[in-house]
Amino acid sequence: MADSSSSLLPLCERISHKSYILRIVDLTILVLLFSLLWYRILHMCENNTIWLVAFLCESCFSFMWLIITCIKWSPAEDKPYPNRLDERVHDLPSVDMFVPTADPVREPPIIVVNTVLSLLAVNYPANKLACYVSDDGCSPLTYFSLKEASKFVKIWAPFCKKYNVRVRAPFRYFLNPLVATDDSVFSKDWKMMKREYVKLCRKVEDATGDSHWLDADDDFEAFSNTKPNDHSTIVKVVWENKGGVGDEKEVPHLVYISREKRPNYLHHYKTGAMNFLLRVSGLMTNAPYMLNVDCDMYANEPDVVRQAMCVFLQNSKNSNHCAFVQFPQNFYDSYTNELVVLQHYMKRGVAGIQGPIYIGSGCFHTRRVMYGLSSDDLEDDGSLSSVASREFLSEDSLVRKYGSSKELVKSVVDALQRKSNPQKSLANLVEAAQEVGHCHYEYQTSWGNLGWLYDSVAEDTNTSIGIHLRGWTSSFISPDPPAFLGSTPSVGPEAIVQHRRWATGSIEVLFNKQSPLIGFRRKIKFRQRLAYFWVLMCIRSIPELVYCLLPAYCLLNNSALFPKGPCLGIIVTLVGMHCLYTLWQFMILGFSVKSWYVSQSLWRIIATSSWLFSIQDIILKLLGISKIGFIVAKKNMPETRSGYESKSKPSQGEDDGLKLELGKFEFDSSCHFIPGTFIMLVNLAALAGFLVRLQRSSYSHGGGGGSALAETCGCAMIVMLFFPFLKGLFEHGKYGIPLSTLSKAAFLTVLFASYHL
């Protein structure tokens, strides 16, 4: 319960990051873009069809920059003060923590274990926490790993709290060598913890290699004769915090769940798993707040729960209307820092409007909001209005919305009315939890319209806009060090596939009932709508692909793409200012020029591969030809994570030894790499043809072709941006472009070079 005294310092503050200099730069770039468009309109009749194509592409780029400028206009974030929490709040609220996983091969159990261990050891009362792991793969190996982790955490959590360990994921903590003296108490405890963690890793790895011995354990009987897409509901209470004495009271609840899946029933991928987590946790612990993280996103800040509670427990109307608190998505092995820069500027910009967009991980939700409440359903003190009480609390409405489980309906009523749940034995609730996991439980209910929303493989964007449409706000906290850290897919096929899924899900939002294009009377601010349009920027992939080919086409056909004479300064100034601006954004955050270049290159590649094929996926779905599937991204764990002694000792830097070599790019024979290879070959052919003509002194300067210097520079810039493909022409193995991809791209290049508008 929070203290209402106004004399106490606030739990959190809204920090504004407005910068008039950045506004001027953004507006200047926008003016230059519009000037270029106006110049093309004035001279459209004097030039060929190429100018019309360029005009359409540049119109798309200008529209996107207009949206970006609007979003970044008033950046803000919330700054929490968790050290003030104990003074202001006498009884901290409970928090349920969700960790979904789906495939023990692509998401190794040891990764899940480290994430769970980091959550179970956070600085928060253990009796107020519960961790639920949803296993959509129904893997006995995942359950076994959690059982072993529950034994290890009984010594790990007290160790972390005793020595105030910051990084509480063991695989990261033990990367750094011991610096204490050998005879110190800490040194002895550290070595003991390292040995125990190595034992844990070995047990998990041994079970991974040969899991047949698990069949002899009666506790694994529920996993017999199961398949990932065909099995009954399994709910296992791995560890229950019953108070107790000593170290046992330091460990929160840990529950393993796997919902029923049958081949002929829709299960809605991760979204369905999140709704099952919502129902099971409501039955068992019914915490008013919930944290969800991806299975590889460990808690890097032990006070992260307390930081989020500072927002929710602040005595203000805004805190009552805050639906979720979003932390940035950061990575310890990132091949690009573009996401860090993006979140620093764009996420803060959105946070200054109605609040950040939910990004699927590192987010604290309010249970009442996920149960379907709108902001208008609450009084100023946070209680339900009389109208909302009649709508939500009638018996018919409860069954129609939430299903036939009496236990779940009772827990929903308690959650909506903010009633505290009496302590219950989790073991006694397993049967009720299994009932709400049946594959037919959601039929003829509102699940999918409340909770995590269906109709998109990007459940985060879809759910986020549904929340903001109901009038709720959200909060953005970006602490230093980052609250959560995760792993990125390898540079190449895995990253491309993941971005394709993200892009496909984002475009799906345009065509469902949560679309920002419709419902202008809903309770969402206009600039917040623009923020969701920015998320859908992947639709610019076609203009991006075309624009990468235009300079080469003009060189090959002796035609002009860019203005001539003094007006060429518009293009030069625009490109130069944009490059310097984005470079400054990287360097001001401490990143290198090389990091900026790699990020620019990678995002051009993603735009012409992942985003391009996501449009194809949407078209095929709309035509009813195919459905969009959910592809689990492979989580890679470096050898240094296993806990075994490493020959090379990393330094004290948190990320030492884990960064991928910049510029290394992996290829496979999938169609994703044909566009990039095609772009590279076309621009190389255009440059080669131009040099040959220049050498023969037969290149014509008339006919509207100009000196072709601008087009040549454009081709050279595109070659630089697609440099990984140039390297791939000469590499072998996974770093080389497969012959099948190269031959298809070469065939397209020949067709392109011989075509004339």
UniProtKB/Swiss-Prot annotation:
GO CC annotations on file: Golgi membrane; plasma membrane
Alphabetically ordered keywords of this record: Cell wall biogenesis/degradation, Glycosyltransferase, Golgi apparatus, Membrane, Transferase, Transmembrane, Transmembrane helix
Disulphide bridges: none
Expressing tissues: Expressed in young seedlings, primarily in the root vascular tissue.
InterPro entries: Cellulose_synth, Nucleotide-diphossugar_trans
Catalytic residues (positions): 136, 460
Membrane topology: Multi-pass membrane protein
Job description of the protein: Thought to be a Golgi-localized beta-glycan synthase that polymerize the backbones of noncellulosic polysaccharides (hemicelluloses) of plant cell wall.
Protein name: Cellulose synthase-like protein B6
Species of provenance: Arabidopsis thaliana
